[in-house]
């Protein structure tokens, strides 16, 4: 029996929607990263984008455990000398684009490179419960019910 290798033309992508309200950030991000990569499928092939399209709603209601809400820092550099900047998770979640916390967590769990960037384009994160993907008829996934540690009441 030969090893199965999925071809890009044979890929069938599903649309799934996940409600992130009261879900632990890291556990949600790990689940979403596996879905985006296609590792949940028996047809997983490392060099082919055969993951699902994932929609995450209510990203502003995510939960961080411990003191990460106030202590976790996100760094970036402007490119100028001494231009290192930082923001806490609290500042981002209470700011203009709270969905970026989820996007960044998932991005850091996907391998870097051309394939990783293509897989990341299949992630759609929204701060509220509204999303423009009703036409895709996404299947709802309850990540909180998979394991009791996935959900925390804030």
UniProtKB/Swiss-Prot annotation:
GO CC field: cytosolic large ribosomal subunit
GO aspect biological process, one term: translation
GO MF term list: mRNA binding; structural constituent of ribosome
UniProt-listed SUPFAM superfamilies: Ribosomal protein L13
Keywords on record: Ribonucleoprotein, Ribosomal protein
Pfam families xref list: Ribosomal_L13
Matches recorded under InterPro entries: Ribosomal_uL13 (IPR005822), Ribosomal_uL13_bac-type (IPR005823), Ribosomal_uL13_sf (IPR036899)
Family of this protein: Belongs to the universal ribosomal protein uL13 family.
Function field: This protein is one of the early assembly proteins of the 50S ribosomal subunit, although it is not seen to bind rRNA by itself. It is important during the early stages of 50S assembly.
NCBIfam families: rplM_bact
Subunit composition and interactions: Part of the 50S ribosomal subunit.
Protein name: Large ribosomal subunit protein uL13
Natural source organism: Bartonella quintana (strain Toulouse) (Rochalimaea quintana)
Gene: rplM
């Amino acid at each position: 029996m030969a090893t199965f290798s999925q071809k890009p033309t044979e890929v069938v992508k599903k649309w799934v929607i996940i409600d992130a309200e009261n879900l632990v950030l890291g556990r949600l991000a790990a689940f979403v990263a596996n879905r985006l990569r296609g590792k949940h499928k028996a047809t997983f092939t490392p060099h082919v984008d055969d993951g699902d399209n994932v929609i995450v709603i209510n990203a502003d209601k995510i939960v961080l455990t411990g003191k990460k809400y106030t202590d976790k820092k996100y760094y970036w550099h402007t490119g100028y000398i001494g231009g290192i900047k930082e923001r806490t998770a609290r500042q981002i979640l209470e700011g203009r684009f709270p969905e970026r916390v989820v996007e960044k967590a998932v991005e850091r769990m996907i391998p870097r490179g051309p394939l990783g960037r293509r897989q990341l384009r299949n992630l759609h994160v929204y701060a509220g419960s509204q999303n423009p993907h009703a036409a895709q008829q996404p299947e709802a996934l309850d990540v909180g019910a998979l394991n009791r540690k996935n959900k925390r009441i804030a």
